[in-house]
């Protein structure tokens, strides 16, 4: 994708507070994100670059932390975590879920994409759940480029992170 440019635009329309209309639209906000996973020669994750459109970045440091936390959480979903159930009851203990340890976390490069003048609360469109949505797909795509094997279930199998 290097050297390519992508463009998209969305404007959420809401009704003013106190508007006398049936079923008023009080808020609407959409976030957009993209992530890229870079593997090293051994197939371990070296870096994840995560670009997120947040509208107005009210607290950039907090946004970076939210992006990093969402990436780490989703890395666990993608690579190591299992939550087995037996008749709808969890069978794993916390220590056996496969949560990533701090020394397993790669470099995460958060990129905050701002668009000024949005007609939403303070111009901010949020940075919650979306931080963990693109990660697993980005990791699966990186492994596909790495070894040509399509992986379609989580946690991804046949990676250096796969539990024996």
Regions found by a protein language model. Give the residues of each.
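C-terminal catalytic domains of large/alpha subunits in multi-subunit enzymes
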Residues: 1-164
């Amino acid at each position: 994708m290097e050297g390519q440019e992508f463009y998209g635009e969305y404007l959420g329309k809401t009704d003013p507070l106190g508007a006398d209309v049936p079923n008023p639209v009080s808020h609407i906000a959409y976030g957009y994100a993209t992530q890229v996973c870079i593997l090293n020669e051994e197939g371990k994750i070296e870096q994840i670059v995560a670009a997120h459109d947040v509208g107005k970045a009210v607290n950039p440091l907090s946004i970076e932390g939210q992006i990093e936390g969402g990436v780490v959480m989703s890395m666990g979903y993608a690579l190591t975590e299992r939550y087995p159930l037996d008749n709808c009851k969890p069978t794993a203990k916390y220590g056996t879920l496969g949560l990533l340890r701090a020394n397993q976390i790669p470099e995460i490069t958060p990129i905050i994409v701002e668009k000024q003048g949005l007609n939403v609360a303070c111009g901010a469109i949020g940075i919650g759940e979306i931080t963990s949505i693109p990660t697993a797909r980005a990791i699966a795509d990186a492994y596909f480029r790495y070894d040509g094997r399509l992986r379609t279930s989580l946690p991804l199998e046949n990676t250096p992170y796969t539990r024996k």
